[in-house]
Amino acid sequence: MKRVPIADVESWISPASERRPLAKALGAENVAINYFELEPGEQFGFGYHRHPDQEEVFYVLDGTATFETEDGDVTVSADGAIRFEPGEWQLGHNEGDERLRALALGAPPDSDTELTRECADCGGRQPTRIERADGEDALVTICETCGGETGRFS
């Protein structure tokens, strides 16, 4: 058994105010567990995405999460959960007025991610990759169609 206070786990660079990788801190090898805190207007992921071989579950602790899906928007309030099958496209946002706290669980833990973001140069959503910004403690999203930067996160 291993126990860890969430506040003791370092937050990683993310579109969310806080993303704390609990699985690593707990030594969990067969499931990814991330703790998130999102201010109004923030999102869980770097873009609309899917994991071809991973199912993903979000449990909302406080606030309300809105998930953009292929079937339209779905809201999940505090003490509610949502599951995405492997290959389902989704992106969760905090469209409310209060802070959103949630846990995200994924299995298997190591999974490829297919990611799209809006590209101003190409127009519309385009396949995207994530890179570390040169000389900065930041991540950038790059359009794979034109090479343009579509987002910067620190």
What are these language model-derived features?
Residues 124-129, 151:
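Short functional micro-motifs and their immediate structural scaffolds
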Residues 1-32, 140-154:
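A short, N-terminal "cap"/entry segment at the start of jelly-roll beta-barrel domains
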Residues 28-31, 43-56:
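A short beta-loop-beta micro-motif enriched in histidine and acidic residues
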Residues 70-89:
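Short acidic-glycine-tyrosine-enriched beta hairpin
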Residues 86-117:
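Ligand-binding loop in jelly-roll beta-barrel domains
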Residues 36-38, 50-68:
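Short, conserved beta-strand element in jelly-roll/cupin
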Residues 130-140:
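Short linker/helix segments within small regulatory modules
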Residues 120-123, 144-145:
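Short, cysteine/histidine-rich loop/knuckle motifs that typically chelate Zn2+
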